């Protein structure tokens, strides 16, 4: 191969360079050596990357059929977004949910399930008439994402072995509920997920369950958007949070993970780890100090109070069982969507 290997210079170093040589990380003492793979002093160590960062979806996903328990007003697909090959998954295939304050998009990943979310007052800008300002001055921001990674090993990342079977994802427009259904390779376990941004409890709820011989083994992490200047994510007691401040508003977001009795939920600096679970619920709340009724459009609440507001919402939601949260949301959301119906006859 006549192509020169790529290399990078180590930050703060006068003459140290790194390159990747056939799966090994090589350290060189000058650029010429790195480019030509020759020269004095170098050290080589084998690269062992984590599969979590190498892959976005399992290799084999077999399509399923339209679920029978969703309304006739529903969008459904039998392939995860990561398998569609589109360049902009958020714009083209992610399914949106919202309650007027908190919104999310779901992509239906099996290996990596990304729940991107935003909140309607997370605004990058200041008060006043924005019509005279540059287009980039103020705009609504993406808050971030919850990442739920499958750690079970039940499916294959790099071969057609152990395929995901009967996969389908959907958005029930009448009930304001998204979902993903699929089965294990041997069809001995049925997996189901339900997502909704509660119209009554004002939180995002993501419900994961496995019925059959296999259990859920998940890692849940927080990924703040890179454009909002968020502080470090803090993981503690089965939950996570982050906060920050932009030109006008200060903000906070937090989630809590719960699982059935008998499952193991542990927390470390890398995230929340759930093992041997039959069901897992993830609850998210987010808020800012924006208040259009106050001077300067600020509520006057400090960072601690904003965080307390978020935690109060989470505490109230997690005190209820999942079925109650689900039924309350569907009853309220569908009451709006069923107010009228237009039937255009053939």
Model-based region annotation:
Residues 50-346:
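Aromatic-residue-lined binding/catalytic grooves and analogous aromatic/hydrophobic interfacial grooves
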Residues 3, 21-22, 31-32, 39, ...:
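Intrinsic disorder/low-complexity detector
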Residues 1-24, 34-52:
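Extracellular glycan-recognition/adhesion modules and their associated mucin-like linkers
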Residues 27-29:
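Beta-strand-rich extracellular passenger or scaffold domains
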């Amino acid at each position: 191969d006549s192509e020169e290997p790529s290399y990078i210079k180590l930050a703060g170093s006068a003459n140290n360079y790194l390159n990747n040589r056939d799966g090994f990380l090589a350290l060189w003492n000058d650029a010429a050596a790195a480019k030509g793979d020759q020269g004095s002093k170098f050290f080589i160590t084998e690269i062992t990357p984590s599969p979590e960062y190498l892959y976005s979806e399992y290799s084999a996903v077999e399509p399923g059929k339209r679920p029978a328990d969703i309304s006739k007003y529903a969008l459904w697909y039998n392939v995860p977004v990561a398998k569609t090959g589109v360049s902009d998954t958020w714009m083209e295939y992610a399914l949106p949910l919202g309650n007027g304050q908190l919104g999310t998009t779901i992509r239906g990943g099996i290996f990596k399930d990304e729940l991107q979310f935003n909140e309607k007052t997370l605004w990058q800008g200041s008060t006043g008439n924005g019509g005279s300002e540059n287009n980039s001055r103020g705009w609504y921001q993406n808050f971030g994402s919850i990442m739920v990674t499958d750690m079970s090993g039940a499916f294959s990342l790099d071969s057609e072995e152990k395929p995901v079977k009967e996969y389908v994802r959907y958005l029930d427009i009448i009930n304001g509920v998204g979902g993903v259904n699929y089965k294990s390779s041997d069809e001995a376990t049925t997996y189901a997920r339900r997502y909704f941004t509660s119209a009554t409890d004002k939180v995002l709820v993501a419900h994961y369950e496995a019925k059959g011989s296999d259990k859920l083994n998940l890692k849940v992490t927080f990924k703040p958007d890179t454009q909002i200047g968020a502080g470090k994510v803090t993981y503690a007691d089965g939950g996570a949070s982050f906060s920050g401040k932009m030109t006008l508003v200060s903000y906070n977001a937090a989630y809590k993970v719960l699982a059935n009795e008998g499952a193991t939920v542990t927390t470390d600096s890398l995230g929340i780890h759930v093992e041997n679970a039959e069901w897992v619920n993830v609850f998210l709340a987010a808020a800012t100090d924006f208040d259009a009724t106050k001077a300067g459009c600020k509520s006057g609440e400090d960072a601690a109070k904003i965080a307390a507001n978020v935690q109060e919402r989470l505490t109230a939601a997690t005190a209820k069982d999942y079925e109650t949260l689900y039924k309350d949301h569907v009853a309220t959301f569908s009451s709006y969507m069923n107010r009228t119906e237009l039937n255009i006859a053939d």
